[in-house]
């Protein structure tokens, strides 16, 4: 690779530790799925689906500024150098786990409570391959420490628009959610 960039390769394993594929080349994965840096939030993404049908503004709750697609989906890649910065959406968002290492997802609710979910395939150890995040919930994610990469998907309905995205303020979250200080520091810029 050019510019001294290190080529990363990992072997994917199933729950029994057996190889299930050829070594994963992260740069190749980015090219194959046309993944680009996700502005403000972090990680890499590519929109994989956007419904061609639209909901008129008058059919939506007041929190939406205009018409919206019925739904959208993206691929989302996390690496050790990236994280999904704390943010919230005006729509529900569902995470889907596809490949790689477990991901820690911090969710902070409006009532002041919060929870850290682990997205992955080891169900015996409390991981979930799918997590639904309700609208208005502050959320951010990172690879579990020691992880090499994770390929996820997210689905949003009504469909995602950047106008529906709000990046969190670190000081505000620290004041409101003192039980999650370490993760808030990790997942904010």
Spans of model-derived segments:
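Short, positively charged and aromatic/hydrophobic N-terminal segments
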Residues: 19-20
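Polybasic, lysine-rich low-complexity intrinsically disordered segments
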Residues: 13-14
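Non-catalytic, conserved peripheral segments adjacent to functional cores
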Residues: 23-131, 140-141, 146-148, 158, ...
């Amino acid at each position: 690779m050019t510019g001294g960039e290190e080529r990363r390769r990992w072997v994917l394993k199933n729950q029994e530790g057996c190889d299930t594929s050829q070594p994963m080349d992260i740069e190749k994965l980015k090219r194959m799925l046309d993944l680009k840096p996700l502005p403000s939030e972090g990680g890499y993404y590519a929109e994989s689906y956007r419904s061609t049908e639209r909901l008129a503004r008058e059919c939506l709750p007041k929190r939406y500024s205009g018409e919206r697609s019925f739904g959208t989906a993206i691929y989302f890649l996390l690496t050790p150098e990236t994280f999904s910065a704390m943010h919230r959406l005006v729509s529900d968002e569902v995470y889907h786990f596809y490949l790689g290492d477990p991901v820690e997802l911090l969710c902070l609710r409006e009532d002041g409570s919060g929870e850290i979910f682990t997205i992955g395939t080891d169900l015996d150890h409390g991981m979930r391959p799918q997590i639904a995040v309700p609208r208005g919930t502050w959320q951010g994610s990172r690879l579990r420490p020691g992880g090499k990469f994770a390929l996820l998907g997210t689905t949003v309905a009504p469909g995602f628009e950047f106008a529906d995205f709000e990046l969190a303020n670190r000081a505000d979250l620290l004041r409101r959610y003192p039980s999650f200080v370490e993760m808030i520091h990790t997942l904010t810029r």
